[in-house]
UniProtKB/Swiss-Prot annotation:
UniProt xrefs under Pfam families: NiFe-hyd_HybE, Rubredoxin
UniProt-listed InterPro entries: NiFe-hyd_HybE, NiFe-hyd_HybE_sf, Rubredoxin-like_dom, Rubredoxin_dom, Rubredoxin_ET, Rubredoxin_Fe_BS
Protein name: Probable rubredoxin HupJ
Protein residues bound to Fe cation: 28, 31, 61, 64
Keywords: Electron transport, Iron, Metal-binding, Transport
Cofactor: Fe(3+)
Cofactor binding, note field: Binds 1 Fe(3+) ion per subunit.
Protein family according to the UniProt entry: In the C-terminal section; belongs to the HupJ family.
Domain Rubredoxin-like residues, every copy: 23-74
GO molecular function: electron transfer activity; iron ion binding
Any Gene Ontology biological process: alkane catabolic process
Length: 278
C-alpha cells in the first residue's frame, strides 16, 4: 500500500517541498505570475518574508487563480545552503542511529547513565563546510564535527587528539569512528550527565553552547590554548626525557660491550699496577 501523497508543486523538483529553500522564487506556469517571499502577497494578505512552502493550502495564484501545485521554481538563491544542510542532516541521522544502537545494546543498564535523558542531536549546521553540533546522550554531551562533502574520515585513528579553532577559543577534539556515521571528531562538554534533571534542560544547554561557541568575547573565558599547550609541552618533555634516558642507557651498554683502544691497551697494566700496590 502506498503512503499518503504530499501536496507539492510541479517542475524540476518533482513536488518535493523539502528541496526548495525559504528564499525560492516561484512562478505560475499558467500565467507566469511570480511569487517572491520577500514581497509576500498583498492580495491575500500574506506578509513579506513568508516562504512559498508556508503559504496556506488554499492559496491560489493572485492573477489566474491557479492552485499552488501549478507553480514551478523560477530561481532559488538559498538552494546551495539547503542542499548542504540536507547533507549534514543525513550524517546526523547516521550519528544518532549509531549512538541509539550503543544505548540500547550496551549502555542502558550501566549505573552511571542518566535514564531521564535520550540521544538527541542539537543545533547541527554546516560550519566551514563541515557539520558541527552537539550530541546529547544519557552518559555524555559532546561537541561533534563531521566531515565535509568529499572528505574521507574512515582513516581516523580513535583516540588521536586535534586542536580546532573557533571564535571563542581553541578546543581539543578526539578522533573516533562508528559503523554508520564513519569518522567524526568529538570535544567533551560533559563527560557525565548526572546533573541534568530533564531532556529539555540538556537540550537548552546544548543550544546555548552552539551560540556561545561563535562569540569572540567568550575567548578570554573559554580559551584553552595555554592549558592545551602546557599539557602537550609536558607530554613532549616526558617523551623526550624517556628517549634521552633510553639513548643514554644504550650508549652505556655499547661502551661496555666495545671498550676503547686505550682501555684495551691499559687494562693489563692497570691490573699489574694494582697487584704491585697490594
Amino acid at each position: 500500500m502506498s503512503g499518503p501523497t504530499r501536496a507539492g508543486f510541479e517542475g524540476s523538483y518533482l513536488g518535493a517541498n523539502d528541496r526548495i529553500s525559504d528564499l525560492a522564487i516561484m512562478e505560475c506556469k499558467i500565467c507566469w505570475t511570480p511569487y517572491d517571499p520577500a514581497s509576500g502577497d498583498e492580495f491575500r494578505q500574506v506578509l513579506p518574508g513568508t516562504p512559498f512552502t508556508a503559504l496556506p493550502e488554499d492559496w491560489h495564484c493572485p492573477n489566474c487563480d491557479a492552485p499552488k501545485a501549478q507553480f514551478i521554481v523560477q530561481s532559488d538563491p538559498g538552494a546551495p545552503a539547503l542542499l548542504e544542510q540536507n547533507r549534514v542532516d543525513a550524517q546526523v541521522s547516521a550519528l544518532v542511529a549509531d549512538f541509539r544502537e550503543i544505548w540500547h545494546s550496551k549502555m542502558r543498564d550501566v549505573p552511571l547513565v542518566n535514564k531521564a535523558l535520550s540521544i538527541e542531536a542539537v543545533g547541527f549546521r554546516s560550519h566551514e563546510g563541515r557539520g558541527l553540533g552537539v550530541l546529547v546522550s544519557p552518559w555524555f554531551m559532546n561537541l561533534i564535527q563531521l566531515p565535509a562533502a568529499g572528505e574521507d574520515w574512515s582513516g581516523l585513528i580513535p583516540g588521536v587528539k586535534e586542536d580546532l579553532e573557533f571564535p571563542s577559543g581553541l578546543y581539543e577534539f578526539i578522533h573516533n569512528r562508528r559503523e554508520m556515521v564513519g569518522g567524526y571528531k568529538a570535544c567533551s562538554l560533559y563527560p557525565t550527565m548526572g546533573d541534568f534533571q530533564t531532556q529539555m534542560q540538556a537540550v537548552d544547554l546544548a543550544r546555548a553552547v552552539m551560540i556561545e561557541l561563535f562569540k569572540a568575547e567568550n575567548r578570554a573565558e573559554t580559551d584553552r590554548a595555554a592549558e592545551i599547550r602546557a599539557s602537550r609541552t609536558a607530554e613532549l618533555a616526558a617523551l623526550e626525557a624517556a628517549e634521552a634516558e633510553k639513548a643514554e642507557t644504550a650508549a652505556r651498554a655499547e661502551a661496555m660491550a666495545q671498550p676503547t683502544r686505550r682501555r684495551l691497551i691499559s687494562a693489563g697494566l692497570a691490573g699489574e699496577d694494582e697487584g704491585a700496590a697490594e
